[in-house]
Amino acid sequence: MSGHSKWATIKHAKGAADAKRGQLFTKLSREIIFAAKQGGPSPEGNARLRLAIQKAKDSRMPSDNIERAIKKGSGELEGTTVIEMILEGYGPGGVAVLVNGMSDNRNRTVSDVRHMFSKGGGSLAESGAVSWIFEAKGVIGVETAGLDTDELSLKAIDMGAEDVNTDEGYMEIYTAMPDMEKIRQQLETQGVTIDSAEINMVPKNTVKLDEETAMQVLKLLDKLEELDDVQTVSSNADFDPEVVEKYHSQA
């Protein structure tokens, strides 16, 4: 892989704040509902649902909430119709941004995302404008305190991982989509505690930014993720760790 944005690491650093916003479980439920509706309520035969449930468990979502979301998706319980959409845009400095949204009202979501792009010094673009820059990859997150990161990196590569990034006490292990669950299980078998494992849109190449532009892009990505209808946000910006630390100290 020729580049990554370290956005998983950045999001990990602010994960506690996300939970305080009270949106986390709502977004996790939405993903489960959509997955169950698309592929059925059985995790064994529905890979997307299986991953959504595991992500919810990783985030300590109560099992009752998970079961209720599955039942809403399968139609056993009444729920709103959820649609998925991929919105594309440009941030400050021409950074490519990919927004994964889920909602019951596409027009509202598009309007909210467009407004946030405009407010953050960017612009919403047409479909296909930047999606070609990204590819879907499995990203496994591991807290590395007390671990030999060199040894863990080699283990992950031996298990079939494509790339590894270690930064600020956190490791991202990048895999091909079909290999993520297998590699996660192998790591857990060897006693590695997994913090998160999800499918992310990872940039094929990244762009370096000056500090001022990087701060603007970080703010835009944060504001987009804070929108109720936005599930995930990806960009092709390569953020300097010192700039990220400065941004969070001012946030």
Swiss-Prot record:
Which keywords label this protein? Answer: Cytoplasm, DNA-binding, Transcription, Transcription regulation
Transcription regulation listed as a keyword: yes
Please provide, alphabetically and separated by semicolons, the GO molecular function terms listed in this UniProt record: DNA binding
Location in the cell: Cytoplasm
Per the record, the domain of life is Bacteria
The GO annotation for biological process reads:
regulation of DNA-templated transcription
| Pfam families documented for this protein | TACO1_YebC_N, Transcrip_reg
| Keyword Cytoplasm on entry | yes
What protein family is recorded?
A: Belongs to the TACO1 family.
Name of the featured protein: Probable transcriptional regulatory protein cbdbA400
State the species of origin. Dehalococcoides mccartyi (strain CBDB1)
